[in-house]
């Protein structure tokens, strides 16, 4: 059976967690190689900076906190939309990485300083990324091309999304939602394929709504 895993461009990725999961799976006997796993080179990265911003914002919200996971997902998506994100492919060029980290930290440090939080050091962030570079860059590739090749060869492709509809940034219980689209339509844009290439959608209905950790339920 032809098996290849693809992490699409619509995902924000914590490279440290990615490496640790690869090590874990290999330890359990799974074959994880650049031939079996492709990670979109345009996927935005989650940095320790994003986790610090996430935690600080939640603390400032007090009783009105959203209930985020604290993993930096929201701030990472913000940077992606604002066109200042560090993307996986950026790790291939130190000069590109340096310039983008300077711009990224300059933006966030204004808020961190005003909030009384420690400022982010671009050199420290770079050191962390460079330590992971050789472990993650071999998996970087064009996810859309992998999917197009699979389609052209009549292979079956299973798209898997995370979280429920009610956590969708547009269609969920806003503002107590995640920072991306979680509905079936996101599979096309988040993976890099045309919407007409998705032939079947399977939805799971539950008797309760998916919520963030401390989010109020609709009845509240």
Locate predicted features.
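A conserved active-site cap/scaffold subdomain adjacent to cofactor or substrate pockets
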Residues: 173, 177-215
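Structural motif
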Residues: 4-6, 35-38, 75, 155-158, ...
């Amino acid at each position: 059976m032809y098996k290849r895993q693809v992490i699409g461009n619509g995902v924000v990725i914590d490279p440290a967690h990615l490496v640790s999961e690869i090590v874990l799976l290999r330890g359990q006997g799974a074959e994880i190689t650049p031939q079996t796993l492709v990670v979109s080179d345009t996927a935005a990265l989650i940095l320790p900076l994003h986790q610090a911003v996430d935690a600080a914002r939640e603390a400032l919200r007090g009783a009105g906190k959203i209930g985020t996971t604290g993993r930096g997902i929201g701030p990472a998506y913000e940077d992606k939309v604002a066109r200042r994100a560090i993307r996986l492919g950026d790790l291939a060029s130190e000069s590109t990485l340096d310039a983008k980290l300077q711009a990224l930290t300059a933006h966030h440090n204004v808020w961190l300083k005003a909030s009384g939080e420690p400022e982010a050091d671009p050199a420290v962030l770079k050191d962390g990324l460079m330590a992971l570079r050789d472990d993650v860059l071999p998996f970087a590739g064009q996810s859309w091309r992998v999917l197009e090749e699979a389609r052209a060869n009549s292979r079956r492709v299973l798209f898997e999304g995370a979280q429920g509809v009610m956590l969708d940034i547009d269609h969920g219980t806003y503002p107590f939602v995640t920072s991306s689209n979680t509905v079936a339509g996101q599979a096309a844009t988040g993976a890099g394929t045309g919407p007409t290439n998705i032939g079947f959608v399977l939805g799971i209905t539950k008797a309760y709504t998916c919520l963030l950790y401390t989010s109020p339920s609709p009845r509240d």
